[in-house]
Amino acid sequence: MGKPFTLSLSSLCLLLLSSACFAISSSKLNECQLNNLNALEPDHRVESEGGLIQTWNSQHPELKCAGVTVSKLTLNRNGLHLPSYSPYPRMIIIAQGKGALGVAIPGCPETFEEPQEQSNRRGSRSQKQQLQDSHQKIRHFNEGDVLVIPPGVPYWTYNTGDEPVVAISLLDTSNFNNQLDQTPRVFYLAGNPDIEYPETMQQQQQQKSHGGRKQGQHQQEEEEEGGSVLSGFSKHFLAQSFNTNEDIAEKLQSPDDERKQIVTVEGGLSVISPKWQEQQDEDEDEDEDDEDEQIPSHPPRRPSHGKREQDEDEDEDEDKPRPSRPSQGKREQDQDQDEDEDEDEDQPRKSREWRSKKTQPRRPRQEEPRERGCETRNGVEENICTLKLHENIARPSRADFYNPKAGRISTLNSLTLPALRQFQLSAQYVVLYKNGIYSPHWNLNANSVIYVTRGQGKVRVVNCQGNAVFDGELRRGQLLVVPQNFVVAEQAGEQGFEYIVFKTHHNAVTSYLKDVFRAIPSEVLAHSYNLRQSQVSELKYEGNWGPLVNPESQQGSPRVKVA
């Protein structure tokens, strides 16, 4: 009797487990059974002292299907977005402006440091005042740059220019790195941030209401505190943990800070950065040429920032070795050495306020393992710490497809930015000129999210049943989700059409319908579409060979330039 009962119980458990798995799988599949798609605009906004954050509701069926959500960050002049992190990777496209990005990667050394000589000249000051500052590498970005933030890694951004920085972020909430649910979460390390995703709070409140009121008083206090992650600890505990006093611990919690998650840095931000130092030196040289008066005894606290064209030229120089670079770490190391040589040439001319650690007589901590691989502890410095996290995608010289009368297309994937392989993301930048057409195509292995940065255009998306699930106009500031294998085509309006496409695969493959026609034998096409051979030849070989088309020039030269 015991054996049949055991078998029956095991069968029942297996049946229940299979049913549960099937229900979860069916629920996930049903999220993409969309009969129509909508152009989405931001649902929520958080205004801070130094800027604005707008978010899209992650519960939109289109976003749930793609497993992503989107946010838009606007940084005013001298605006600082406070350090935060999320349990999933984040891909950011800079639609406007320029600035600085700081990423605090665990286990990596602080390679930017104040010079030792500067501290020694302070003579009479106390030992605490002589301590020199140091931090991890700072990356600079310009319009058209794509930034990648690893999951769980704190980052901050700062506007170094005179115009607002506009950054669009894709949050890949369904990424395998996220071991939580797909509800968007942002963990702030500082400030008193407001709620960016109200749907997250609503779900938490529903869970609490189902769980009863066993911890009612504690939960109420928790809700009243809010703020950064440090606000969940007591002042006494923070003081003990960081070996400081409770006054500093209270400031870390920022209970009365009304600036929220973006603050304005009065007078500008001063950090250790070779690029900012070079720009400061250039500005000082201009002052020397313009004025015959004596140079002030101390440089300004915040160096002014160079012109956008200079930044783009520097970025373009970084991109040149892309087709045949030996390794990512070596390329950045060589680039840093070039910057150091430039700084050393200018050293006798004047003392510097800030310098990179690599210009000091003593060698940086991570440089010796690079020279002698046998002494490397675990290779972290070569793999994670030197990982390139940004690349410009909007520069015309980066175009993969180009038609002078229709537009251009640039692709960014793990082949051009290897870090994307770890995060399973890629991107495409499309610029369509007046009336230009991006012919029908689909993604073989990825969902995509279109965000319009300039202009407006007509977009049509067709599902597996041949129905147009979206047929309308997209304008600046709107986004549209295109599920995997859905066929999409775009045409620019009178003012052109410019947009970024986020894709949920590190090497997303796009199939163009025109290419498919050319890959199929003429006889197959003739019988499939009931065409004559002359019509098949016209279908396969007439018109543009690439995906970019201008209908007004179709009767002219059929050639299209491919970069």
Swiss-Prot record:
The keyword rRNA-binding is assigned to this record: no
* Chain positions covered by the region annotation Disordered: 108-136, 199-228, 266-375
* Tissue specificity as recorded in UniProt: Exclusively in seeds during embryogenesis.
Q: Which PROSITE patterns match?
A: 11S_SEED_STORAGE (PS00305)
Q: How is it modified after translation?
A: During soybean germination, seed storage proteins are hydrolyzed by protease/26S proteasome.
Gene3D superfamilies membership: Jelly Rolls
Which SMART domains did the record assign? Cupin_1 (SM00835)
| A Gene Ontology molecular function term of the record | nutrient reservoir activity
Q: Where is the composition biased (Acidic residues)?
A: 279-294, 335-346
Q: Does this entry carry the keyword Disulfide bond?
A: yes
What InterPro entries does the entry give?
Answer: 11S_seedstore_CS, 11S_seedstore_pln, Cupin_1, RmlC-like_jellyroll, RmlC_Cupin_sf, Seed_Storage-Functional
Give its localization.
Endoplasmic reticulum; Protein storage vacuole
Signal peptide extent: 1-23
Cystine links in this protein are: C32-C65, C108-C385
* Principal location: endoplasmic reticulum
Sorted keywords for this record are: Allergen, Disulfide bond, Endoplasmic reticulum, Seed storage protein, Signal, Storage protein, Vacuole
- UniProt lists compositionally biased (Basic and acidic residues) regions at 347-356, 364-375
**Transmembrane intervals:** none
Q: Where is this motif: Vacuolar targeting signal?
A: 551-563
PANTHER family assigned to the protein according to its UniProt record, in alphabetical order: GLYCININ G5, OS03G0336100 PROTEIN-RELATED
Q: What does this protein do?
A: Glycinin is the major seed storage protein of soybean. Glycinin basic peptides (GBPs), and, to a lower extent, glycinin exhibit antibacterial activity against Gram-negative and Gram-positive bacteria (e.g. L.monocytogenes, B.subtilis, E.coli and S.enteritidis) by forming pores and aggregating in transmembranes, leading to membrane permeability and, eventually, cell death.
Q: How does it assemble?
A: Hexamer; each subunit is composed of an acidic and a basic chain derived from a single precursor and linked by a disulfide bond.
The entry's family comment says:
Belongs to the 11S seed storage protein (globulins) family.
Under which name does UniProt file this protein? Glycinin G4
Give the encoding gene's name: GY4
